[in-house]
């Protein structure tokens, strides 16, 4: 079944995460990394975690979001190398989108953690 709302690479969304005890939810930001064509044909969407807990020095794979306010975030935040899928219909809302500079950083982060796919052949 196709979905009507489609997100672009770099869109910042809010997802409901359950509390560790299983009662209640936390609303957390994440960034879309799946292609629109993937989303048109699937019920899920592929996301990468965003956190406002910034510890220096950053861990391997973490990247500071330079234009966090333009992305719709409330605080300075980082991209974390935690990839997950989420049911599209459960997304709460879109906050904004990463700037082109931050999208380039996201692209580099993905290459750092996933490697160069062309080199896999």
Residue ranges and their predicted role:
Residues 18-22:
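Short, charged beta-turn/beta-strand-edge "cap" motif at the junction between a beta-strand
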């Amino acid at each position: 079944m196709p979905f009507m709302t489609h997100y672009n690479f770099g869109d910042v969304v809010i997802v409901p995460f359950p509390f560790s005890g299983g009662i209640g939810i936390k609303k957390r930001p994440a960034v879309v990394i799946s292609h629109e064509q993937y989303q048109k044909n699937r019920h899920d969407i592929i996301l990468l975690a965003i956190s406002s807990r910034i510890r220096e020095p950053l861990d391997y794979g973490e990247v500071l979001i330079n234009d966090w306010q333009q992305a719709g975030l409330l605080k300075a935040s980082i991209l974390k190398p935690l990839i997950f899928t989420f049911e599209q219909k459960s997304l709460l809302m879109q906050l904004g989108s990463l700037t082109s500079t931050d999208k380039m950083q996201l692209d580099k982060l993905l290459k750092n953690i996933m490697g160069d796919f062309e080199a896999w052949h």
